[in-house]
Amino acid sequence: MNKNLLVFGFLIFVKIGETSKKFPLRAFVASTDIDNDTAHAIIEMLRLAEMTFNALSDVDFDVLLGTRDLPPMEMATMMWNLNRIICDEMKLGYMLMLAGTNFKNYGIYEDIANHMKMPLIDWEPSKSENIGKTTENNPMIFSVAPSAEQLLIDYIQYKGWRDVVYIHDGKNADRTLRTMFSYLHEKSPKYQLFVDNYVAPSDEEMFKEFLNEFHRRISTQHTLKSNDSSEEIDEPIPVNVIVDLEGSYRTRAFLRALEESVLVKKEYHYVFSNFDVDETDLSGFHFSLINITIFRIFDKNNKKFLKTRAEFHDVYRGGFSNTDSIPTAAAFAHDAILVAGKALQIAMNEHGKGIFDKSFVRHQLFNRGRKGLYCRPHEDQTESRQFETFEHGKKIAEAIKKVVLTDKDGTLTGRIQFDKVTGKRTNFSAEIVEIKPGVNSLNSIWERFQWAEGEGFLLGGERYVQEKKKDSSQTRKGILPSKPWQLRFNVVTVLVKPFVMLKRRNPGEPELKGNDRFEGYCIDLLNLLAKNITGFEYDVFISDGNKYGSRQADGSWDGMIGYLLNETADVAVAPLTITQERERAVDFSKPFMTTGISIMIKKPEKQEFNIFSFMEPLGMTIWIFTLSSYFGVSLTIFLVSWFSPYEKRIEFKRGEFTVTNEFTLYNSLWFTLAAFMQQGTDILPRAVSGRIASSCWWFFTLIIVSSYTANLAAFLTLERMTPPIESVEDLANQNKILYGVNEGGSTAAFFEDSIVPLYKKMWNFMVSTTQKQIELEKQSITNSTSNRIFVSSYADGIEKVRTSKGKYAFLLEETTNNYESGRRPCDTMKVGQNLNTLGYGIATKIGNPLRVSLNLAILYLSEKGELKKLENKWWYDRGQCDTGTSDGGTSSSLNLSKVAGIFYILLAGMVLSMCTALVEFLFRKNKENREKERNRMRSSRPLKPGILASCERAKQKQLQNRRTKSEEVSTPRSTLF
């Protein structure tokens, strides 16, 4: 039993060892100061290809890719520095080198590959000087990128050109021309071709000046020829220009300069000989007077290409936002990894699966039994080493020669096969795309040629005019329309108020058909476009599921974008947001409307007034401080009046002179209250100190009463509806109100892709809330999805806002938000500013020349104010709600509910006054009764004679004192105390 277990465990160990083989590769990626984005794109595509190959089920090993970034190097030190970097990497060991060579560094790679017998797979075209297959070329370098010399010659012969202008970088001209003429002589010995050479500037900023001078020189030459010729030349002399520049950056810079160049005429025909130009780069030439031809090696309709493109743009979002393609160099680098993996597999099949087992131990290369591989043996200090080449180099190189890959194997650039003598790519195919824009872009002619090496142009070239039928998958070939645009366009849209809506049919009216079924902003826009574009006729249909279009996991698109890509529709006219992701899939016109993401909430109920609403113009803190000030000032006036001698008075009362002070505590409170209520009193301070205190109190009451009056007038006559949130920050920083978006739309993509912390926080909240709701639904018997915050359409989101009693906010475009807020039942509103700025555009398939005419028509309508009129018509002129004042409230007259409190206070004051009067009356009555009772008791008590005489004398003395004081007061010297 134990023996069987040991054997079983050993077999498992062996199997794991077999499936865990990792063969290292090394990629050297050079970056430049001006085009660092391409280097990053190449690295990402290399990693993507590594994962693609390692995921294959029929391969029992993995490739382990290591990348080495090569910084910009000076020409003088490049040989030493690059040689040192490659040899240092070789000490660690790898099975294959991958690189993108150029004319500056090709010789270094060539020397190392030959010297060390280390195969190199190059993702740039071959720079070898050998031309014919009879001469043995370097068997260690293989170029995945094909050379275009044969394609150029075939194209020149197809066009029948005898004179061409060749614009190049200088270093590649001799090799390219020798290859072209060698192939031409082999194919057509009697065909004569004259080439005029021009060297392009090394600085891309000088391209425009170079082209202007070039066009001026060509124009001068043609003028001189016309003057020297005895016959009149009715037609201009054609100028056929071949542009052969190194790298996509320089090629695209040349295109931009050509677009801005002057003196260019319709007789010019520019041919770009590399594969770095895409159809989207030609959008600026639809209305130019020149012809442009490009070579394309991608099949954009291939599912593998679409999937890889989607994965690439997921991991790398820089530098290539204006194209739906992949950088050509990055695509060739991707295929180079597949070639390397396939070659290793072939070598193992031919020489045994264990051929490389002894070469790598613990990720260290052992070459011929010695650790590492040294370009310079003396650098190994640990042992005496002789120079030795890579022992498996020739076997791997021979395996590369046997590699045959197609798009079924995952390649992006079609069939890959190498010439066994030259190492160049052979038996490849390409597509030639030629644009001949006319004055009316709707009649622009495109020519497409399918070309295969050794066979030439398939079917003799395929010429067609971009016309659309109801079955848009068919294309009329070889003819021009007899009349402009007699065929109709298929326009796809979605039902979104007020852009596109179904017309209401009144009872008794016939059933609506065709375009008459719809109304709305977009329908009116289509009518205006039809009036301004000759022959523009259309049929409108609704997108299945009312979907705008989002990219699927396999790289395909649904919704309106999907209809455009599969050519079921020609144009998409709807509130379709222009986004970076959609721009890669389709072409957009100029925006016909600008909007942004906004917040929709349920309109709060009108503010209810309580009986103490009159106190709300001032905050509670102000009321407390005012009341405290009242008592404080009253006490202050009382104290300063008590201590100030100038506030005292002498009064004659009951026959006596007494010193009195009118500002008792009771009178001080009354005086201060009267001043606060803007009323007068019969007492005023006489002392300076009392007047200072009173003046400050009067100033205080003036400001308080004036402010209160102003706020009270606005407060009581304005009905405010205070929203629970006023900005996106308020929404994100609370958890009582849920919020969501339309699932799969551009708004959801905005939050998902945003790098703004606030928006990332909101997206994470929406996702986590949805997951919690799904878990609750799984546990629920009803399994209802009505509580989910993500909705399938705008209509569902708006309805959710209306039925959630203020507990749900919907994030949507401002246009729809404003429209719904102005429609019955008038219970929604927009809050806060827009989160971003978006544009709605008309979408067409990439390369459709109709886009240019749409752009011109939209700009014309915008300048004439027609687009603004449409907006006013559908948003404001047909509004059903009272918009009210701009500050969020509506002005109205006072009603009892707003001022009921003051009536209650008045009534309470009157009742309190009467109650107080009653208490005072009872108190006084009781006091008088007690006084009468006391006097009665005194009068009834008999007095002794001695006591009676004493009382009489005291009374006489008191009268005498009063007379004396009266005489003193009447004298001139009498003064106040």
From Swiss-Prot:
Topology versus the membrane: Multi-pass membrane protein
Function, in words: L-glutamate acts as an excitatory neurotransmitter at many synapses in the central nervous system. The postsynaptic actions of glutamate are mediated by a variety of receptors that are named according to their selective agonists. Required for response to mechanical and osmotic stimuli.
Annotated family: Belongs to the glutamate-gated ion channel (TC 1.A.10.1) family.
Transmembrane segments: 622-642, 696-716, 899-919
Organism: Caenorhabditis elegans
Taxonomic lineage of the native organism: Eukaryota, Metazoa, Ecdysozoa, Nematoda, Chromadorea
Name of the protein in question: Glutamate receptor 2
Predominant cellular place of this UniProt entry's protein: membrane
Residues bearing attached sugar chains per UniProt: 36, 227, 291, 427, 532, 566, 783, 895
One Pfam family it belongs to: Lig_chan
Extracellular side: 20-621, 717-898
Signal peptide region: 1-19
Record's keyword terms, sorted: Cell membrane, Glycoprotein, Ion channel, Ion transport, Ligand-gated ion channel, Membrane, Postsynaptic cell membrane, Receptor, Signal, Synapse, Transmembrane, Transmembrane helix, Transport
Record localization: Membrane; Postsynaptic cell membrane
A GO biological-process term: modulation of chemical synaptic transmission
Keyword Nuclease recorded: no
Molecular function GO terms recorded: glutamate receptor activity; transmitter-gated monoatomic ion channel activity involved in regulation of postsynaptic membrane potential
Annotated InterPro entries: ANF_lig-bd_rcpt, Glu/Gly-bd, Iono_Glu_rcpt_met, Ionotropic_Glu_rcpt, Iontro_rcpt_C, Peripla_BP_I
